[in-house]
Amino acid sequence: MKVHQIKIDFNVTEQIKRFVYVYILEAESLYLIDSGVYGSETKIMDYLDSIGRNTSDIKGVFLTHAHPDHIGSAAWFREHSGCKIYASEGERLWIEDIDLQFKERPIPNFYNLSGKSSKVDFVVKDGDEIRLEGGAVIKVIRTAGHSCDEVSYLVGDCLFIGDAVPVKGDIPIFIDEQEIRKTMNILETLEGIETYYPAWDRTYDREMMKSRLADAVEIIDMLKNTVLELDDGTDLETLTSQVCDRLNMQMLKTNPLFCRTINCLRGGAIMTKS
């Protein structure tokens, strides 16, 4: 099975530019790992045309989690190709009801990024194996923490990890300290994986992934230790500002997603979908 990586550029605001990677698994049929933001179907379909494939070849979209830059064009592909949508139970509610997601996790430009709600045809869980046309198997591995029930997808010796790993130089976004640490341990101890496919960077071999995981644990520990040192029971907004000043992250002071990270590190309520 051949893997194609497509970079999707988008803007959260006019000033905040981001990107995400969508992956295409190509065999007799095609399968997407995540779907980018709303409107990504145009770039994806242009790419498919360049390799001699078309919409009807897409049989499934496997979503790692429910955030807008991953689910944005899922509804479009389901409608136009008849493909099935796969996601975990914990992420399903926000995929099937983006209004609920906006209510519980508002971000700028939300609806322009997330597009439309999409039905999840198949709910997956840790350990599930889905047999694709042509005989390939996708195995589901729960890698929560960044979101409440994120999953990674293992195909042969390739692991598609979405946003499971915090990245140096980017906004550390996770909602559950225990889960994110558990995920780092799971990814470190998995055997037989040769290539890792993140949603936010080029592919990694095993040694590079080992380094990225060490960086991620360092980020989590640094934030945790800073929170423990500074937290005197003050309100969350003030604590977040103090952490940002201490770590020279002033640009994150008003970022609501980073504020949630600080909240979980001080032992605040875990924000899950209900």
Regions flagged by a language model, labelled:
Residues 15-18, 123, 134, 144-146:
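A short catalytic or substrate-binding loop motif that flags glycine-/basic-rich loops and adjacent residues
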Residues 39-42, 49-130:
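Active-site HxH/HxHxD metal-binding segment of metal-dependent hydrolases
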Residues 31-33, 62, 85, 158-160, ...:
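Residue-level marker for buried hydrophobic side chains located in beta-strands
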Residues 1-51, 151-164:
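Conserved beta-strand hairpin/beta-sheet module of binuclear metal-dependent hydrolase folds
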Residues 1-10, 108-112, 134-135:
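Short Pro/Gly-enriched beta-strand edge/turn motifs at strand-loop
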Residues 39, 137-222:
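Metallo-beta-lactamase
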Residues 44-47, 73, 180-183, 223:
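A general structural detector for well-ordered alpha-helical segments in enzyme core domains, enriched
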Residues 188-195, 202-274:
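Accessory terminal helices/loops
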